[in-house]
Every structure is written in C-alpha cells, then in structure tokens.
Amino acid sequence: INAFFAKECVVYALVAGLFSAGNGIVASFLLPLAEERGIPNISLFFSINAIVLFLMRLTIGKLIDKTDLLLIVVPSLLVSAFSFGLIGYSSSFWIVMIAAVFKALGHGGGQISLQSACIKCVPPGRVGVATATFYIGADIGQGFGSILGGKISSVFNYGTMFYLTAIVIVVVAGLFTIYEIHRRKTVPKDVR
C-alpha cells in the first residue's frame, strides 16, 4: 500500500478533501438555494470565485514558502467557513458574490498550502505518491460533499446544509491545529 499512498500526508489530503467537499456542495446546491430564495444571476458566483482563485494562486506561492503551515491553513479554513455561513444566510445577489470572494480566498490559500505540505513531508523519490495522495483526498471530498449535502438538504433545507458545512469546517480547523501541534512535537524538525 506504501506504493500508492504516502501515509505521512494523509491528514493533509483529508483536510484538502474538505475544501473539495465544499466545492461539491456549492456546485450541487448553490443553484437550488438561489432558486428557492429568488437570487438572480447566481452563475456569476462561479465566475467571481474563479477570478479570485486565479489571482490568489498567482500570489500565494511565495507566502507559502515563507509562512508557517498553520498560519495559512487555519485562517483559510475559517475564511471558507465564513463563506459557507454567508451562503446559508444569503438572500441577495451581493451577499452571494461576497461569499464567492471569501470562498476563493480560503480555498486558494488552504489547498495550495496543503499540497505543498504533502510534497515537503516525503523524500524526493516519493513526491509523485504524495501528490497522488493529496489528489485522492480531494477527489473523495468532491464526491462525498455532494452526497452528504444531498442527504442533509433533504432532511433540513439548503440554508441549514450550508450552515452545517461551515460548522464542520470550523471543527476541522480546531482538530487540524491540535494535530499539527502534536505532529511538530513528535516529528524531527528536519523531516517537517
């Protein structure tokens, strides 16, 4: 199994999967939420999100190389959670567009940082396996988010589903902080 997965970066891949789960939820349920609430031109969410995400990816690389992982991933998770809370609350076009910006900022900082961490935590001969592990986590998250979002929205409603997503992201931010602090105490500094 070591030939297919880099166990050193499974936690990073799972957290990255949470960002992808958010993508699956937004892609599947933003339009029905907008129709339910009468929010027009909802497709602009995806355009705004893509533009900000593109700009974020152009600029975040240098910051990632100089900044502690926790100082990027945890705020990115919290910003993402805020965006899902905004979507859950939204009743107007502009609130959804603001959420698009925040979602891109969170996703852009978080996923790139986690991918970089996956690559850094393995020897050079396992970079491909680490990258594959990262993307497996992202792929699982994408599918799982849509499925779980469908179950939650069928029991409650779309707004509640987005609120619950925000809560899960905040909890994961806390758990990731605990994990990373513990990992740093147990892993030699030159392996981090």
Question: Each PLM stretch: what is its role?
Answer:
Residues L71-L86, A166:
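Structural signature of the two symmetry-related core transmembrane helices
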Residues Y12, W94-A100:
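Short hydrophobic/alpha-helical segments at membrane-entry points of transmembrane helices
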Residues E8-S47, L53:
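Extracytoplasmic gate region of multi-pass secondary transporters
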Residues D68, Y89-S91:
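Helix-breaking motifs and short loop linkers at transmembrane-helix boundaries and internal kinks
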Residues P124-F134:
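Loop-to-transmembrane helix entry/capping segments in MFS-fold secondary transporters
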Residues M56-D68, S153-S154:
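Helix-to-loop junctions at the C-terminal end of transmembrane segments
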Residues K151-I169:
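A membrane-interface helix-boundary motif in multi-pass transporters
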Residues G109-V122:
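Intracellular juxtamembrane helix-capping segments at the cytosolic ends
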